[in-house]
Amino acid sequence: MRLPLPVSRVTQNGRPGYRWGESGTFYGYTPGNEASRARAEARATRQGQAARAAGYEEPTFTPPASVAAAARRGLALREAQPPSNKAGTAVGIARARDLANRRPLSVDTLRRMASYFARHEVDKEGEGWGIDSKGYQAWLLWGGDPGRAWVNRQLSNL
């Protein structure tokens, strides 16, 4: 599946700039200088367009069945809860749908998932962790333990 190569605003060594996709060149600009910012964005955009024209595609990763199953369990568990106990942000629910449907994910999405798992690993040690807890529901929405293991494995191979 071909995913778009977006131009995004990034920071490198404390300097603002633009980059397309995950592997594009960093084009820095001078803060407060609109002309410099516009040039950097235009250069990154042109590089992305040239890469697309040459047939370049960013790598994608299809979630395995175990991750899809965990996300489906999370969605089902969330649906079975009363409104006051439904977990998951809009982003978490969207991620669960992508995982459950085994949609290809970008490297950037894998990194966001790894960040989620790193931040929320401690939730598992909290009181009340279990099938009815919001933390458990949210963990499953992001793919659960199989998701964490898969994401870490994919990122370590890059």
Describe each model-derived feature in a short phrase.
Residues M1-L158:
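Arg/Lys-rich, low-complexity, intrinsically disordered basic segments
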